[in-house]
Amino acid sequence: MALDSAKKAQIVAKFARKEGDTGSPEVQIALLTARITELTEHLKIFKKDFSSRLGLLKLVGQRKRLLKYLKNKDYTTYSKLISELGLRDK
């Protein structure tokens, strides 16, 4: 379920604050969203893959924490990011 390096590099390039930025919350959230999307598609096919389902729940929780951090830290970046990724605001 891991992202291939070309797709990962494309996501990092799109959401990075500067060149070589892989640790900013925006990049981390975008990468987690891509992994969550892939795992969701996998689980639509393999409904009884419970270990992958647990991994999906962990990824969703991690993304939720990062989104909460970004919302408190920089709301304008947060709102721009969720609109680009197609996420909902609580």
Swiss-Prot record:
GO terms for cellular component: cytosolic small ribosomal subunit. Keywords: Ribonucleoprotein, Ribosomal protein, RNA-binding, rRNA-binding. One of its GO terms (molecular function) is rRNA binding. This is Small ribosomal subunit protein uS15. Belongs to the universal ribosomal protein uS15 family. PANTHER family: RIBOSOMAL PROTEIN S15, BACTERIAL AND ORGANELLAR (PTHR23321), SMALL RIBOSOMAL SUBUNIT PROTEIN US15M (PTHR23321:SF26). The keyword Ribosomal protein applies. CDD domains: Ribosomal_S15p_S13e. One of the primary rRNA binding proteins, it binds directly to 16S rRNA where it helps nucleate assembly of the platform of the 30S subunit by binding and bridging several RNA helices of the 16S rRNA. Part of the 30S ribosomal subunit. Forms a bridge to the 50S subunit in the 70S ribosome, contacting the 23S rRNA.
